[in-house]
Amino acid sequence: MAYSFTEKKRIRKDFGKSQSILAVPYLLATQMDSYREFLQESVPPAARKETGLEAVFRSVFPMESYSGNAMLDYVSYRLEKPVFDVVECRQRGLTYCAGLRVRLRLAVMEKDDTTGAKRVKDVKEQDVYMGELPLMTEHGSFVINGTERVIVSQLHRSPGVFFDHDRGKTHSSGKLLFNARIIPYRGSWLDFEFDPKDHVYARIDRRRKLPATTLLRALGYSTQDILEMFFDMETFRLIDGDLRYVLIPQRLQGEVAAFDIVSPETGDVLVQAGKRITVRQTKALSEVQGLHEIPVPDSFLLGKVVARDIVHPETGEVVVQANEPVSGELLDALRKMPSLTLHTLYLNELDRGPYISETLRIDTSRDAHDAQMEIYRLMRPGEPPTKDAAQNLFQGLFFSPDRYDLSAVGRMKFNRRVGRDEITGPGVLNDADIIAVLKVLVALRNGVGEIDDIDHLGNRRVRSVGELMENQFRLGLVRVERAVKDRLALAESEGLTPQDLINAKPIAAVVNEFFGSSQLSQFMDQTNPLSEVTHKRRVSALGPGGLTRERAGFEVRDVHPTHYGRICPIETPEGPNIGLINSLSCYARTNSYGFLETPYRRVVDRRTTDEVEYLSAIEEGNYMIAQANSTVDEHGVLTDELVSCRFKNEFTLANPDQVQFMDISPRQIVSVAASMIPFLEHDDANRALMGSNMQRQAVPTVRSDAPMVGTGMERVVAIDSGAAVVARRGGVVDIVDGARIVIRVSDEETLPEEPGVDIYNLVKYARSNQNTTLNQRPVVKVGDVVSRGDVLADGPSTEMGELALGQNILVAFMPWNGYNFEDSILISERVVAEDRYTTIHIEEFSVFARDTKLGPEEITRDIPNVAEGALRHLDESGIVVIGAELAPGDILVGKVTPKGETQLTPEEKLLRAIFGEKASDVKDNSMRMPAGMYGTVIDVQVFTRDGIEKDARAKSIEEHELARIRKDLNDQYRIVEEDSYQRIERQLIGKVAEGGPNGLAAGNKVTKAYLKDLPRAKWFEIRLRTEESNESLEQIRAQLEEQRQRLDAVLEEKRRKLTQGDDLSPGVLKMVKVHVAIKRHLQPGDKMAGRHGNKGVVSKIVPVEDMPYLADGTAVDIVLNPLGVPSRMNVGQILETHLGWAAKGLGKKIGAMLDSEVAMAEMRAFLAEIYNRSGKKEDLDSLTDQEIRELSANLRGGVPMATPVFDGASEEEIGDMLELAGLPRSGQVTLYDGRSGDAFDRPVTVGYLYMLKLHHLVDDKMHARSTGPYSLVTQQPLGGKAQFGGQRFGEMEVWALEAYGAAYTLQEMLTVKSDDVSGRSKMYESIVKGDFRMDAGMPESFNVLLKELRSLGIDIELEQSK
């Protein structure tokens, strides 16, 4: 196999047994593809599919005036180039977006007076601006107002029809009440339901119910039509007063015979009256000849329901209406008529209930008009119904494409559920649809068919960014449509253009609201690269049109068999959102309908093939699917007698011959975060859940350290997240410094019109959304040859192109003086000294100078009443200098605000006369460092409003930025120029010249020496013999010139952006942003965790010499409590510890071999022993000796291992690795007490564990208040760190003081230390004077209580006791 540039530097030993035939797909594909489909930016207008934006425009346009004489139609749209790029938008607090220009055609018609036909009078076509559309960055996020946001995908109930029952909870008898619900993509919901009396009702939009037959009548069906649709008929004939029954023997099966059934041929009694008719008798009856009609007694007909109106043949009068039961009188009346055929409903107790017939009896409406009026009263209570209004409302509910849309998905689901073969159809409902649903519902009540499982992933679909945005855009456009229709009337008379008709504000408002405040638009979790990826792959059941936390029951949150390979069963938040917010599995993707699907490899005749097929949850149920770790031989044939499979959502064992598909990979069922946990299969699910969630909270450390025991997913996440910089094209590294990498692209990857240079500007100490540091470091050197896709630079939490969330730490599982009681963690001082867990956090402080009523605020160094020492960090503009080390209270930006004129005392007037005006009319309003925060200034940005002169600091920042851009462009031009001249040189040397500068005579050959002496600019003056060569030279010259002009234009554009004024919010004249870097060392109180849900808080940092140590003197770094393992059942951490120790031991062995300079052959043999003993085989022979030497050097710190989830290293393999490293196979060793030097009395498990430092840092949580702000009403100190609040001395604490009888302490607590306003200020004075007496006054909260009582009308007065 071919290794990439960084992979060959440090190969990860892979224990995986199952061969992977499909690489993990691009992790952000769901987001990227969805938005790309929505915008179709790069697709020419004529070729665009009708999805996304295009679909919205096509569905809303054309807009017609009410008279029909003017029409506005859509032609196409285009997106303009964004004004600012992503980085600039982040800095300036802008939205990264592009203007949307829509080409519209306005046609004005006129009527021909003679024919009445319309003809086009005037057509205008114009590009209309329709607001701005946010663009997605190349990593799947959006920049909105300068912050990165993610639009989370929503998992909602798919449109279609669903059948369910109430699980017997509604009625006390426990009877199952069935219901059906037709859910459209947009429009009114239609429900049908049974009540306890078995009547069928309909509800529209969950309003009051009405009989379902009312809806059928409104569709124009009569009672007879309805009965014929839902029931089979029984036929009776009255011939000369005799009643005969048309016999269908199958219908008698299971019934009790009401009379003797006699054979007409023999006269034998075939079935005796009162006996139940068996299957055998039914069969015998069907074989008897002449038994088509049998005479029956009148009692057999009585009570049956008439199915069709009976009309008197002579008078034409309706004698009996359909749906009437047959009574004795009715039968007598019918007998008076000549011969008659009577149809009744075929009903029975078991599977032919009279539900629709019974419902018709309670239905008060008689015809379509009545029914529509009834529906109108239900939908618009209080409004007087008219025939037209009722008809229009009913038509608009389910049958109008403007108001109702099932969508392609809904139609497909609907047709499949009601048993139709065709899966396409109209987006609106029709009569047949409603009848089909009722038929299925009645069949369910009759015991035929099954209800739907709403938690099945075939009934829930994913709405991603593109679709959510499409819905919002449609909302905006519909609002615009209303206004346009009103204005179109004017277009006819006043000759308006499309631009005049359209106001884009409603669209902009809807889009901004969606991105700014929708529940699904979330502030991106940027703690580390994994948290970014996970956030973009999240699927939420909450949000508009989804569930709410309070209403969601247990079933919705639970893991469903269809989640397999689609949604991770492990990763979900703890707390109220559990199960409602999920993560996509590694290989999952959405299909064209929005259903999640997962890949499987096809199995044919026991043999696994490389053919991959994606199946959705609906399709998957029909196949027998084997697990990924089923044993196969070298030919890919399943060898086991029985294979563990899934079939129809159940787990089963099957014969290999029945297997049709097989999982792609064992990690298929889990999400990205869960697949990063080694030995996941040995952890309890609850702890694995914590492990996956806590990895997302790991803070990037100053020195990244990739895990020695990983899972092989580390590289995928680092690259797909965008944290690591990846080469766009292959080539040679030309320049590398800390902030950028310049690559000279290889010729075969350069197109003629493209520059042959790629410049990668690295992100340096930028602030993430969570205030962690985003910093990239190059991993290549000048001269390195890189290919496309190779890692050029590491980002935050990545090392050598692999994700590195924490540190490999030497851990011992043992108690240590109680300092690791209850999950506490004991740490060695060495961990802190080596900066293993030191993190840098960047805080951003923004200062605004506003225009106030009293005059403009000013950012200045001239601040009243501030000592010169306090200004030591400020430059002449009053802004802190970069590199200043600040402490709490230090001034970051000096700002003065004008204050109103006050009446001055004579002394102040004298002082003002002496010292000038300035001192009194402004007050200090400077931005200072908050309490408890120490840090270094690393960046300052100054934004000035257009028309206001920039200060010196703003100008110097501008010049610095311009110089950086110029340097980039110069390098780009230099490489392109260098490349061009090399091509010219190759073309000129050895060619015969026609003439040239410096006396080059015609007929002479051009030599290298001649070119060396000739200035390069004059090379183009050389004329060659062949015209073709001259043209080629001219082409290179033109390309070079064009490139220079293009780069000049880019520089000019950048200069214009930098020098123009900034667009600040109203009233703001100047904005200064200061970034302060804060270094946080590991300290007691910080939260740490492993990857197995083993979390704890640092309790003590112990000197190295006191820590337990191994026999060779190595002190352990961290001591964990062994009691944290058995009850938590996360044994994965123990296996990781053992394998980590083996990895480290092998690294030490390799280091020793390098130091003793063994032969390369010996080194290769040892590496082969490590890499190829078990698991995946590595192709070490493809590496050169130099590469093997570099690989070995990188393995000194430990051989990185990968144990993929559900396919990892076995206990046996871990033991082998420990032995190979020369360590005890048990993984345990005798430790010695650092303080006494004595050996502990039993061996201790020791090894390397990957530990993370989480974002719950004690510095962010702890604070101490001296004096600070008070609540306005109660005058008690505020609470919480953000308000610089105090510790609440609450009710229970007061009880404690009362119990101890500490009266004076209690009085202090309730008065001067809390809300006795005058008392606390006196207290301050008395402390200053050294007088420690105390007079307690009235607490303010008592006054509040009095006011509260008085407001209730109870007068309370306080009287001084005499």
Curated annotation (Swiss-Prot):
Tell me which EC number(s) this protein carries. 2.7.7.6
InterPro entries the record matches: DNA-dir_RNA_pol_bsu_ext_1_sf, DNA-dir_RNA_pol_bsu_external_1, DNA-dir_RNA_pol_su2, DNA-dir_RNAP_su2_dom, DNA-dir_RNAP_su2_hyb_sf, RNA_pol_bsu_bac, RNA_pol_bsu_CS, RNA_pol_bsu_protrusion
Output one GO BP term: DNA-templated transcription
Listed PROSITE patterns: RNA_POL_BETA
Q: Which reaction does it catalyse?
A: RNA(n) + a ribonucleoside 5'-triphosphate = RNA(n+1) + diphosphate
Superkingdom of the organism of origin? Bacteria
A Pfam family hit: RNA_pol_Rpb2_3
Record's GO cellular component terms: DNA-directed RNA polymerase complex
- MF term (GO), any: DNA-directed RNA polymerase activity
UniProt KW keywords = DNA-directed RNA polymerase, Nucleotidyltransferase, Transcription, Transferase
Q: How does it assemble?
A: The RNAP catalytic core consists of 2 alpha, 1 beta, 1 beta' and 1 omega subunit. When a sigma factor is associated with the core the holoenzyme is formed, which can initiate transcription.
PANTHER family named in the record: DNA-DIRECTED RNA POLYMERASE I SUBUNIT 2
The job of this chain, per UniProt, is described as: DNA-dependent RNA polymerase catalyzes the transcription of DNA into RNA using the four ribonucleoside triphosphates as substrates.
Cross-referenced HAMAP family: RNApol_bact_RpoB (MF_01321)
Q: Which family does it belong to?
A: Belongs to the RNA polymerase beta chain family.
Q: What is the protein's name according to its record?
A: DNA-directed RNA polymerase subunit beta
